[in-house]
Amino acid sequence: MGKRDRADREKKKSKKRHYEDEEDEEDDAPGNDTQEAVPSAAGKQVDESGTKVDEYGAKDYRLQMPLKDDHTSRPLWVAPDGHIFLEAFSPVYKYAQDFLVAIAEPVCRPTHVHEYKLTAYSLYAAVSVGLQTSDITDYLRKLSKTGVPEGIIQFIKLCTVSYGKVKLVLKHNRYFVESSHPDVIQHLLQDPVIRECRLRNSEGEATELITETFTSKSAIAKSVEGSGGPSTSRVTDPQGKSDIPTDLFDFYEQMDKDEEEEEETQTVSFEVKQEMIEELQKRCIHLEYPLLAEYDFRNDSVNPDINIDLKPTAVLRPYQEKSLRKMFGNGRARSGVIVLPCGAGKSLVGVTAACTVRKRCLVLGNSAVSVEQWKAQFKMWSTIDDSQICRFTSDAKDKPIGCSIAISTYSMLGHTTKRSWEAERVMEWLKTQEWGLMILDEVHTIPAKMFRRVLTIVQAHCKLGLTATLVREDDKIVDLNFLIGPKLYEANWMELQNSGYIAKVQCAEVWCPMSPEFYREYVAIKTKKRILLYTMNPNKFRACQFLIKFHERRNDKIIVFADNVFALKEYAIRLNKPYIYGPTSQGERMQILQNFKHNPKINTIFISKVGDTSFDLPEANVLIQISSHGGSRRQEAQRLGRVLRAKKGMVAEEYNAFFYSLVSQDTQEMAYSTKRQRFLVDQGYSFKVITKLAGMEEEDLAFSTKEEQQQLLQKVLAATDLDAEEEVVAGEFGSKSSQVSRRFGTMSSMSGADDTVYMEYHSSRSKTSTKHVHPLFKRFRK
């Protein structure tokens, strides 16, 4: 094959890798996604036409943001571009934060000043939990140090004027379009498409409008002790003067009152045909009145209640309770997404939601291991009988007879190829059931087209998405707002850490100089083998070995992560440590994990990317990362989550968990590392850069001589490009396993002839045929 053809193909591959390096979950095939119907307001941005810009591009907001006289007592700055800055040291910080989490998206939350951003979707979420347009604008004005810019007020009104005013409610197994605004109902009924969706009686006449008054109260009772909410008492200085302006204090009391009081609401509704629900939803979005889905589970007499309750030992933490109150705030179940850090108890939130609804529940995870863990969580926290839990994976297909809780994976339900007879029977059963609640674990990782497939296969009245990292490099994360529902709650990682609900982690980036021989080859080689060179850097190996020895002497439990299987095996075998990767059998995995948990002699294990989200190891308190998936922010946060669980019986000190990311200096790995840290830095974490590990010279470490390093280099150079690739986990979304690629390879992989190289190439054209080719074309062929 010609040099130019190879160069072009390599250029295309590198361009493709540029996008793949960001996030492995965004691998939807182009053209397969149909555009979701969304309200036009969702694409709106804050109008900044009145903002002056100087010659350097800086924006002058002085005329739009005049300071109030008592600005020192108020915690917010509201900028005309929609960004809101909150002073975390303000005496009224707790209240202001609760309000901002409800109406805006967190951008960055370091120690002293937090940044949020108003978006159309965040305002949709605010309306969905009961906030009115006037509430949002009034509260912002009272909390702000300056006047709120008029552009912000108009943007809030535009996004909230119609959203949340119409609900699709399931009562007694019948669907109703309901609103507390009669004029909105009349406006909708003037549309011919909606009139067609309206249910008619036997004479062909439309059913009557139903007017009723109901009392709404949260289905989650607020705990009296330790609710975790901020105190409503005034903050006073030593002289007894209040630091809080009167209007702010009145506003806080009103917020508490609104949350606690029973509320009587008069609604108008009409019944619609069940078979036309999807068409009705699309038409309402087109009319700028998107339907909010609510499930009146207490009045659902068609679907039987299941025998499930929380055990007395299950005690909700304040943030878990608050997230569930957002979901069940008006006595009905709202569909939406709850965002909690890894290790903060997302599973208990899901189990509590199932115990509250008490209808048949379907749980979907992203792997067979997560299915087993969800089953264990239901048995740990609830009174459900083991016979009522049914698993549906490639390995475990429990009989669904008498089942109330079904647990499966996205890939099992979204599978489109031929199934076994047994799997077909279970799928038929799943399709025919009417599920009260669907819990979607790790909801951010699944492409939108997979959701649409899953959501059309099974019918559920309420959908709850759970995740720790609601981030994607593409724009598909916004699809969750209309495929599942708005974000109901997002916790603050630093607050949970300071309260002791998650571990206090010291994050460190360890810079490992490349040895001269390795760096010479790294600069010369342009293939994927560069990844192997900076992963197998002898100085990185020595740093890893030193950290393992240091923490084992402290009796710490250590996990070492490597995405590259070649490096994983080399490190683990050389250090004589057990390792787990894709082909490791389930029995061997469980044996290694049990030894790691309970055997004091096994304090270190090596794990490939299979452990990113599937493994629950609360004993681990040290994590060392030697290779990773490019610049994936999600993976960095998920791996940190392996050591985030609160530590029991640890020595009281500043940090009780450690996260080390080993990076080879002056390589592409450093740029990836900076990208990976963005999400955690935005959550308030700081990464300490270590250029030299104290005491490393005194240890007896591997690869201390030039001869050993040269032998390692020869081993790396003898490896194939296939060895340099990351592990592809079976059943993982976005995996490239179904794609076919052409590579160079050594014959040793097929016949053992190590010195023979097998290459594919096209025979070049005969030299005689180039005599009559114009020189211009010769030039392009070079």
From Swiss-Prot:
According to its UniProt record, how is this protein modified after translation? Answer: Phosphorylation on Ser-751 by CK2 controls the 5'-excision activity of ERCC1-XPF endonuclease; phosphorylated protein inhibits the excision activity and thus NER. Dephosphorylation reactivates the 5'-excision step. Phosphorylation has no effect on transcription or the 3'-5' helicase activity.
Q: What is this protein called?
A: General transcription and DNA repair factor IIH helicase/translocase subunit XPB
Q: Which Pfam families match?
A: ERCC3_RAD25_C, Helicase_C_3, ResIII
NCBIfam families (UniProt xref): rad25
Q: Which residues of this UniProt protein bind ATP?
A: L340, P341, C342, G343, A344, G345, K346, S347
List compositional bias (Basic and acidic residues) regions by residue number.
1-11
Classification via InterPro entries: ATP-dep_DNA_Helicase, ERCC3_RAD25_C, Helicase/UvrB_N, Helicase_ATP-bd, Helicase_C-like, P-loop_NTPase, XPB/Ssl2, XPB/Ssl2_N
Name of the gene: ERCC3
Q: Which catalysed reactions does the entry list for this protein?
A: Couples ATP hydrolysis with the unwinding of duplex DNA by translocating in the 3'-5' direction; ATP + H2O = ADP + phosphate + H(+)
- The listed location of motif DEVH box is 441-444
Q: Which GO terms describe its cellular component?
A: nucleotide-excision repair factor 3 complex; transcription factor TFIID complex; transcription factor TFIIH core complex; transcription factor TFIIH holo complex; transcription preinitiation complex
Its organism's taxonomic lineage begins at: Eukaryota, Metazoa, Chordata, Craniata, Vertebrata
Activity regulation description: Phosphorylation on Ser-751 by CK2 controls the 5'-excision activity of ERCC1-XPF endonuclease; phosphorylated protein inhibits the excision activity and thus NER. ATPase activity is stimulated by TFIIH subunit p52 (GTF2H4). DNA translocase activity by this subunit in TFIIH is stimulated by XPA, ERCC5/XPG and XFP plus ERCC1.
Subunit info here reads: Component of the 7-subunit TFIIH core complex composed of XPB/ERCC3, XPD/ERCC2, GTF2H1, GTF2H2, GTF2H3, GTF2H4 and GTF2H5, which is active in NER. The core complex associates with the 3-subunit CDK-activating kinase (CAK) module composed of CCNH/cyclin H, CDK7 and MNAT1 to form the 10-subunit holoenzyme (holo-TFIIH) active in transcription. Interacts with PUF60. Interacts with ATF7IP. Interacts with KAT2A; leading to KAT2A recruitment to promoters and acetylation of histones.
Ranges annotated as biased composition (Acidic residues): 21-30
In UniProt terms, what function does this protein have? Answer: ATP-dependent 3'-5' DNA helicase/translocase; binds dsDNA rather than ssDNA, unzipping it in a translocase rather than classical helicase activity. Component of the general transcription and DNA repair factor IIH (TFIIH) core complex. When complexed to CDK-activating kinase (CAK), involved in RNA transcription by RNA polymerase II. The ATPase activity of XPB/ERCC3, but not its helicase activity, is required for DNA opening; it may wrap around the damaged DNA wedging it open, causing localized melting and twisting that allows XPD/ERCC2 helicase to anchor.
Enzyme type, top EC level: isomerase
Question: What's a BP term from Gene Ontology annotated to this protein?
Answer: nucleotide-excision repair
Q: What is its EC number?
A: 5.6.2.4
Question: What GO MF terms are annotated?
Answer: 3'-5' DNA helicase activity; ATP binding; ATP hydrolysis activity; DNA binding; promoter-specific chromatin binding
Residue ranges annotated for the Helicase C-terminal domain, each copy included? 542-702
Please give the residue ranges the record annotates as the region Disordered. 1-51
The record's comment on protein family reads:
Belongs to the helicase family. RAD25/XPB subfamily.
TM stretches of this protein: none
Q: Where is this motif: Nuclear localization signal?
A: 6-18
UniProt-annotated location(s): Nucleus
Q: Which residues form the Helicase ATP-binding domain?
A: 327-488
